[in-house]
Amino acid sequence: MSTKKTKTEDKTLDQQTEQTPVTAAETAPKTRDLDNLPEDKIVRTPLPSKTLRDMRTQFIRCLNAKYIHTDNDGDYAIEESRDGKTLYLLFQWTRTAYDWISNFDFVAKPYKDMEITWRCHRGFLRVWKSIKPFVKDAVANPKYTKIYICGYSHGAAIATLAHEYVWFNRPDLRSKENPDGITGYGFGCPRCYFGSILPWKKMPQELAQRWVRFYPIRNLTDIVTHVPPRIFGFRHVAPVVQLGRTDKWQIIDYAPNFPPRVAMHCDPNYLLSLDDGIKEAQELEAYQKEVKRANNLAAKKAASKKTVPGSGSKEEK
């Protein structure tokens, strides 16, 4: 029997082996998710590689920080850059049984300290209030021209509240001269804002603007980012950044004994998804740069043809 391949078979093989890379937006989970509603939407647009690299750097900083323990099991760390101009506020993940009690204490409690009263997850608010006295002096220090707020899991919810506190107390870090002075990252972030059980009711704009530079981050279908459930009225404070690709779901091997949606919450899997996202973003940026260069070259050639001396002179005569 002949083993020679026909041209048709070769063409089919080429099509199978030379597949176009799939973007994170195209491979994001297709399951129905109420987070897709306008007031609690997911950002599926690829972020710049610079932003993703910054996310990774701050996540590693958060994982390696030396945390200080307070009442109500609040765990925080304060660090600064070598030049002394950047402050890092870091908040630890769920660590003790009391942390779990706070996580599940999702009664909506009015929060009145930030001028605009809004209802918040009671357990997270209690922890944040126990930490706030220890960080307020650092936040108020004018030598810091940039403040990062970063937390993971339980700590991401605390970072959400800390971010608003920094926004409210340091208006100079959100001025026209320094619009990027505050940046917040919440890895595996639970919901802490209580809006309404009515899905069409949105967060007021004057409140939403406080988290314009805060990124709630989800790895694939990480279950922690879906609690407390929307049916109870809870929402994320800003659009959720989606990490990970469903065609690379096997990265959950770092937690083989957990269900997939739980394993996706593990920090090694967040790092792997960030690495994958950085690589994909760099490839996309290189492609866009090449397309821009080719378009500019084509435009220059077209312009040079129009400006050739004597062109069209015979027709004018």
Specify the residue positions occupied by each region the protein language model found:
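Non-catalytic, mobile gating and regulatory segments of ester bond hydrolases
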Residues: K4-K7, D14-C150, H154-G312, E316-K317
